Swiss-Prot record:
Coiled coil feature spans: none
Molecular-function GO terms, alphabetical: UDP-glucosyltransferase activity
Protein name: UDP-glycosyltransferase 71B7
Organism: Arabidopsis thaliana (Mouse-ear cress)
UniProt key word Glycosyltransferase: yes
Length: 495
């Protein structure tokens, strides 16, 4: 029996890419399965590469993996604080798209049965649409199992009126939270801003309640990476979790305008000794002001290590403008910096991160701790130094440094939040230099543990590996639910 899943990714380039990779993996593993991906209008205009990527997806549609692009006609420009409103506005469009899909299938013999919705972690309001059609909902969670478990626990504490974290003082709090899914007490001051801010906390608590309505949750993680968390989740009263990662976009993301830059960077790396270069890159939304840039430059020069630095100027409003290039680096960097470091360092703007991490010359990665970047570094066996900037990255830093021992810390506690516009404290050159020296130690325990975890990540995706097994269990569960749905419909019809 053929069956189909309807995927609804969050309208942002990073989430869309991850969802597409998940969909490709599923159809590759199960010949009876087809997938329709409904692409919603993006919240922010001008995301780098978004329009070209969506156009390429549309052109690649086939009978196993289709892309339904919802028009952005009359789409208002909105701020991040109205994500929930944006998703609610899309419900009628999703409803009509699915209804048309069902109508098309009803007129064609041997058409697949729709087996359910697979929703992005930020699209949980679409559960209501799935329920209207009588379809079960599953979720694709693009972050770690750890932050999923913490969100559940915060929601439970809020429902019991036991969560008393104050937005006004959490950054200076000495209190800790004992999350049952973590082996160590979690400092309140390390909470993601969204789990402390008055504006955001209700949004995430409501999301967590919706998470509990799912039939199952696909998580972009590896059983061997988060065993303590996954063991807890498997014994709790939450939906079953399927760790199917690492799910990475490792193909060349071709962009003709950047091909020459890519080649120049890779040629430079190819001339460096193995494991000798520290790579600094902070994601598409990571940038710094002039004072912080100078501190980084001083640290790099003092360390004496070879470096590749993806340097970008901080944006005054991240939702209206992504970080960009400095007009004149000579005016920003310490006087004579380029002359003194020309033989050991290279300062760039945009970076082909996957290609860089895959190069044997890279020996360490100073990162914002985005979950995709974290998984990429583990996949290529590159140890990291944690410099969280926004979203759940403070948690990821805690997980990698304190829980797992797979990263070195630059500083223990981080103030401010890029997305919320909260000022971040300047990290000193001394702190950065110390972390780089620790990161680049060739025989460190962290490096050995990262190499071991890299091997486990590769094995997880092989036949018989933990992630392959989890993926197969998910497919079997979806197929089993179709049979259950058919029996329910038959029972109703007999009545």
């Amino acid at each position: 029996m053929k069956f189909e899943l309807v995927f609804i990714p969050y309208p942002g380039i990073g989430h869309l890419r991850s969802t597409v990779e998940m969909a490709k993996l599923l159809v590759d593993r199960e010949t009876r399965l087809s997938i329709s991906v409904i692409i919603l209008p993006f919240i922010s205009e001008g995301e780098v590469g978004a329009s070209d990527y969506i156009a390429a997806l549309s052109a690649s549609s086939n009978n196993r993996l289709r892309y339904e692009v919802i028009s952005a006609v009359d789409q208002p420009t909105i701020e991040m604080t109205t994500i929930e409103i944006h998703m609610k506005n899309q419900e009628p469009k999703v409803r009509s798209t699915v209804a048309k899909l069902l109508e098309d299938y009803s007129s064609k013999p041997d058409s697949p049965k729709i087996a359910g919705f697979v929703l992005d972690m930020f699209c949980t309001s679409m559960v209501d649409v799935a329920n209207e059609f009588g379809f079960p909902s599953y979720m694709f969670y693009t972050s770690s199992a750890g932050i999923l478990s913490v969100t559940y626990h915060v929601q439970m504490l809020c429902d019991e009126n036991k969560y008393d974290v104050s937005e006004n003082d959490y950054a200076d709090s000495e209190a800790v939270l004992n999350f049952p899914s973590l082996s160590r007490p979690y400092p309140v001051k390390c909470l993601p801003h969204a789990l402390a801010a008055n504006m955001w906390l209700p949004v995430f608590v409501n999301q967590a309640r919706k998470f509990r309505e799912m039939k199952g949750i696909l998580v972009n993680t590896v059983a061997e990476l988060e065993p303590y968390v996954l063991k807890f989740l498997s014994s709790s009263d939450t939906p079953p979790v399927y760790p199917v990662g690492p799910l990475l976009h490792l193909e060349n993301q071709r962009d003709d305008s950047k091909d020459e830059k890519r080649l120049e960077i890779i040629r430079w790396l190819d001339q460096q000794p193995p494991s000798s270069v520290v790579f600094l890159c902070f994601g598409s939304m990571g940038g710094f002001g002039e004072e912080q840039v100078r501190e980084i430059a001083i640290a790099l020069e003092r360390s004496g290590h070879r470096f590749l630095w993806s340097l970008r100027r901080a944006s005054p409003n991240i939702f209206k403008e992504l970080p960009g290039e400095f007009t004149n680096l000579e005016e920003v960097l310490p006087e004579g910096f380029f002359d003194r470091t020309k033989d050991i360092g290279k300062v760039i703007g945009w970076a082909p991160q996957v290609a860089v991490l895959a190069n044997p010359a890279i020996g360490g990665f100073v990162t914002h701790c985005g979950w995709n970047s974290t998984l990429e570094s583990l996949w290529f066996g590159v140890p990291t130094a944690a410099w969280p900037l926004y979203a759940e990255q403070k948690f990821n830093a805690f997980l990698m440094v304190e829980e797992l021992g797979l990263a070195v810390e630059i500083r223990k506690y981080w103030r401010g939040e890029h997305l919320a516009g909260l000022p971040t404290a300047t990290v000193t050159a001394e702190e950065i230099e110390k972390a780089i020296m620790c990161l680049m130690e060739q025989d460190s325990d962290v490096r050995k543990r990262v190499k071991d975890m890299s091997e486990k990540c590769h094995v997880a995706l092989m036949d018989g590996g933990s992630s392959r097994t989890a993926l197969q269990k998910f497919i079997e569960e979806v197929a089993k639910n179709i049979v259950s749905l058919d029996k329910e419909f038959e029972h109703v019809a007999l009545k």
